[in-house]
A protein has these predicted regions:
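Class I Rossmann-like S-adenosyl-L-methionine
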Residues: 1-226
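SAM-dependent Rossmann-like transferase core, predominantly class I methyltransferases
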Residues: 218-253
Length: 253
C-alpha cells in the first residue's frame, strides 16, 4: 500500500477492512503473540497495507494508550479497545499522514460497524475519535505531561534503562526508534551490480541511493514483488547495517 493523502489505488483493499485486521493483530501482540507469525496468516493482497498500519500504530502506541485513557477511563472490550488505540495511534502520529483525519475516523467506525464483535461499540468509537479531532492539542498536552510511555512510546523501565546506560544519547536513541525503518536491498553481486539494479529501479519509478558495498536504499518502501530482480534472486532485503556486520567482524579476526 502506498497511500498519498487519502488516495489509494483503485484495487486497494478498503481501509475499514485493513483497520479490522490491524486491530486484531495489535490485540494479538498485546496478548503476547508474535506479530511476524500473525502477519503470515493475512491474505497476500491485504498484507502490505495492514502491515504498514500496524507498524505505524505501534510506533505511537504509548501515546495512543494515554489518549484512550483520557477519552475512555473505563476500557472497552479488548477488540474495540485495540481498534480505538490503532486509530488514535494513526491520528496522533507525527509521521506524514497516510490518510486525512476524517477519512480515518470514518473508516475506523465503519470497521467497527462491519465486525459483529465490535458493532455495538461503533457509536462509542465514533464519539471518542471525533472528540479527539475537536480537542486534539489539549488532549495531547495532557497525555504527554509526565508520562514516559506516552512521550517516548516505550515502557518506562526501558526509558529509564537507556537514561542510565546512555546519559547523553538516550533521547536520540528513542527518537530514532520513532522513525520508519528504511528499506535496504542487498544486490547478489554474482548476478548483478549496484549500478544495474539502480537503473532498473529508476526505470520502474523507484528512487534509490547507493550505500556501502552491495547495499541500495529505497527512497520509499515497496512490496518486494514490485522490486526488479527480487523473484529471480538478484536482490534481497537486508538492512545496510547488517550487511556491514560480517566484513567488520572478519576485519577484527
Amino acid at each position: 500500500m502506498s497511500p498519498s493523502g487519502d488516495r489509494s489505488t483503485l484495487h486497494a483493499p478498503p481501509l475499514w477492512r485493513q483497520l479490522q485486521l490491524a486491530a486484531r493483530l495489535l490485540r494479538g501482540v498485546q496478548s503476547g503473540h508474535s506479530l511476524t507469525a500473525q502477519l503470515q496468516d493475512v491474505d497476500g493482497a491485504m498484507r502490505p497495507g495492514v502491515q504498514a498500519l500496524v507498524f505505524r500504530a505501534l510506533r505511537w502506541w504509548g501515546l495512543a494508550r494515554a489518549l484512550r485513557s483520557q477519552l475512555a477511563p473505563r476500557s472497552p472490550a479488548a477488540l474495540p479497545d485495540a481498534l480505538l488505540c490503532t486509530a488514535l495511534g494513526l491520528l496522533s502520529s507525527q509521521d506524514p499522514p497516510a490518510y486525512a483525519p476524517f477519512t480515518l475516523v470514518d473508516q475506523a467506525v465503519e470497521a467497527a460497524k462491519r465486525d459483529p464483535a465490535m458493532r455495538s461499540s461503533a457509536a462509542f468509537l465514533n464519539a471518542c475519535l471525533r472528540r479527539f479531532l475537536r480537542e486534539r492539542e489539549p488532549l495531547l498536552r495532557q497525555a504527554l505531561h509526565g508520562d514516559l510511555a506516552a512521550r517516548w512510546n516505550h515502557p518506562p523501565w526501558w526509558v529509564e534503562r537507556l537514561q542510565s546506560d546512555h546519559p547523553t544519547a538516550w533521547a536520540a536513541i528513542l527518537a530514532s526508534a520513532q522513525q520508519p525503518a528504511p528499506m535496504d536491498l542487498r544486490v547478489n553481486t554474482a548476478r548483478s551490480t549496484v549500478d544495474a539494479l539502480r537503473q532498473r529501479l529508476s526505470a520502474a519509478g523507484m528512487q534509490s541511493t547507493a550505500c556501502t558495498g552491495a547495499a541500495v536504499r529505497l527512497a520509499r518502501p515497496r512490496p518486494v514483488q514490485e522490486i526488479p530482480g527480487f523473484a529471480a534472486g538478484e536482490v534481497s532485503v537486508q538492512s545496510a547495517a547488517a550487511q556491514l556486520a560480517a566484513p567488520l567482524l572478519l576485519r577484527g579476526l
